[in-house]
Amino acid sequence: MVSKTFCSSPFVCTRQNAYDRISPCAFGPIEVDVPMGTTQADRWMHPDLTSLRNKFLNGDRPSECKRCWDEEDAGIQSLRQRTNEAYGTDITDWESGPREIVIKTTNVCNLACRSCAGWDTSLYWPEGEYYTNKYNTTKIDRSGNKVPGNDFMQWRPKVYHSSDLWTPADLRNVKKISFFGGEPLLDKQHGKLLQKVIDAGKANVTTLFYSTNCQQIGKHYEELWSQFKRVEIFFSIDGIEKQFEYLRWPGNWEKTKTNIDWFLNLPNRYPNVDWYFQGSQCVSVLNIAEYNHTAEWLEDK
């Protein structure tokens, strides 16, 4: 009998970023550094991920998964529960590869949002360098040493997730691929992975998910998207008009509206795809008073 604390995520999902870090789910309860060039098969069977799987098989409630436990204790449906509903808990043949792939494609972004920082947008880096030079700010690096820097900066260069390591065998179980950034639509290399899924004959059973800031359209990918079962586009909109441009600097509201309309017209051009669109707000003290106003605008779209 499956434990009531069981989570199927480590058995069905892999999250990867452009820095060669892997994790068992979208929330990243643990992040494991792997050498560049490590095969997807070796990433999937990494000992640290297997250790977490064994904890769930033994009926444990791993402390690494604190976010889900806290949400459940507060009466909120957690990612663990949603994943169990989506994939079930009778997991077989999991060793052959993931069903769901979550990729943080890049740290490159064309916005410096108030809710973000340097690890997810390269546009913050010049500001971080300014603070370091003017105020001598410091941070702790990955070796535990104090070095010049702050959370607006990254020691890594601009990087993109490599699609070259994925083989047809790695994709044999895939049902969903989610793309986050940075800004995933700025990463043209991820189109290689889409083509590999198509070539593997899996596109017609695979859902694609994107979280986009709406500052660009998907003209480079629409022909690829047209071959997939379902495409989900989440628009990151924390406010409208002047509030949007403040919270998501240097975003342009008129351009944002035009681009959203472009996305919403995709079902007319590709009616065989199951399209899904949703607005997504990052709520903070900066926008909570206008939350309903923004939500109403999104509903009207």
Predicted regions and their residues:
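Detector for the c-type heme attachment site
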Residues: 69-71, 116-122
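Catalytic cores of alpha/beta
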Residues: 285-300
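Core AdoMet radical
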Residues: 98-108, 119-161, 172-188, 200-219, ...
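Accessory C-terminal segments flanking Radical SAM cores
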Residues: 1-86
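Acidic (Asp/Glu)-rich catalytic clusters
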Residues: 223-230, 267-268, 299
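Recognition helices and adjacent regulatory flanks at domain boundaries
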Residues: 73-100, 109-111, 132
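Distinct, well-ordered alpha-helical segments
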Residues: 189-195, 218-225, 290-292
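N-terminal pre-triad scaffold of radical SAM enzymes
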Residues: 6-19, 91-119, 175-178
